Amino acid sequence: MQKGGAAVRRWILPGCVLAALAAAAVLFWMGRAPGFSDVSRRDSRYPAIAGAVEAGYMQPLEDGSFAPDAPADARTVVTALLRAIGEEAEPAEEQARAHRLVLSTQTVDLDATVERRAAAGMAARALDLLSIAGESPYADCTDGYVVKLWEKEIWREEGGLFRPEDPITRGELAALACAAAGADVSAGAFRYSNYWVDPLETVPENPYDAAAFTWEGDTVAYTGGGYTALRGVDVSGYQGEIDWEAVKADGIDFAMIRVGGRFTRSGGLYDDSAFTRNIQGALDAGLRVGVYFFSQAVSAEEGLEEAAWVLERIAGYDLSMPVALDWEYLDGGEARTTGVEPEAVTDGVEAFCAAAEAAGYRAMFYCNRYCGYIKLDLRRLTAYETWFAQYDLFPDFRYTFTMWQYTSQGQVDGIDAPVDLDLYFIPD
């Protein structure tokens, strides 16, 4: 926020800060309102500043001033936000990482200033919010966390500009901490894996009847109306030599064959050792065949690179099932996907699928509940089929999908090793 009273009025006070104003008024009339040498009680910033100090989120400076226009350092930002959500604030860096204010891939200098965009991300993550948000109200910032705070009425700026690279000031931080403390981020959301997830209204819902999934041994059938469910396997070199005629005779209708993948640390691409043998064997046995690529793409460019790799290798094969991107999240150590944001993941998946469709194939992407809710913006992917993985009695994913991977320990004639089993749903 720029210096001067006019700039301060650009912050739209949410209800929780208005509550702080009421509390500050009570304290004023009781003679217990905090005073600052540089912030008048008539200053529009005073309620939030007084509220933040009274609540213990922030402290005035030693000389009795508050310095509302001075940049806040990272230690002050971390401390204020952690205290606002009722958590211990010391040791600051350790607690910041524990509560995701600072991601495992990020370095932190507690004495450095903090950009407004970064402060928004810290506040959103402290509140267990995701960066999957709608259209930005700001001309200069599309950051998902910034937009999410606007949607939740926690941090809103007038004038259509957010100035994301400016440092957050102490006055702005006071307002943000008070807003975070009073926010009801659970309204309309559901809880998954320590996050509050807002339902995606434009993504079609799961259409399947949970009671219509019937099990016999380690295989499942779907007996509900409206769909025919084909039985399938997805395989790679890990399954070794496969007798595809025996697979076909065991009632399998289709096979998804791995083309290759991307290494989880180096990021290099590799071929599956059994791709050529498997795809030709499955086709010769009369199975419906599709392919997949194990992805660790973290950008649109890498998604396109993976698509080009796959398209070159499947040229000339008659595929009647989708070309799928199997993006999976690996966290910790040297995994290249650690801490990657949904926008970057979705960029890669969308680029791959668009390239596959442009080449004349049906595109599909793979996800489990974690990736579907936390790591992908499914609103951008509704043009493509979803391959959903959940090892349970029935799939309870909120959104639609066309293929369900229901076990990794299946037993099929002709395949000596445990194998992934799938159902593919075809509308009647």
Predicted segments, located by residue:
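Substrate-binding/catalytic groove segments of enzymes
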Residues: L129-G134, E153-E158, M364, Y373, ...
